[in-house]
Amino acid sequence: MPINYEYIVVLGGSELAYTSSITNKLSLNSSSERLIASVKLANEKKNRKIIFLGGTSSLLEQKNIIDETDVAKKFFRDVNFDLKRVIFVKETKNTIENLKKLKKLNLRIEGNSILITSAFHMKRALLISEKLDLILIPYAVDFRSFEDSGRDGLINYYQMFSIVKNLKSLNLYFRELLGIIAVKISM
């Protein structure tokens, strides 16, 4: 990864906006590494800015519910990160809208920015950015793997087998696969 990049582009998706709204507390999901990595990388050089792309993926309007951007803002505040170094892009529903709005910012991001998202989502995000002529350097986080993968032997594998976890993984895989197909067809 190049050392001299100016912008850290973070895709939303690690925030539990509904839970955060109800509890009035910061609530993140298993993709929270996206936010954590952005702060870590931004703190390496004081001139780096974070561009947070988020909104709500809900197709229905939800009153009195904060969105991903509001939760991310709370996260940055809670870790004492200077909000003047964060550009928040709101009101998007998916990665295509996120990256289209990023392009409209007219910042000098070409080859000067890294893209942080979950490893499982990176292929689709880069495909979209390529279709939009955005050159972003990938920085994958949130790698998903078998827990306790250090164990070996059939008995131990059988003990780790979980239908629910496997169905969640399969759901994630098919969602990304359908997303990639949709991008290739529609863009």
Language model segments and positions:
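A structural signal for short, hydrophobic/glycine-enriched beta-strand patches
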Residues: M1-Q159, I163, L167
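A transmembrane-helix-recognition feature enriched in membrane-embedded lipid enzymes
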Residues: N166-M187
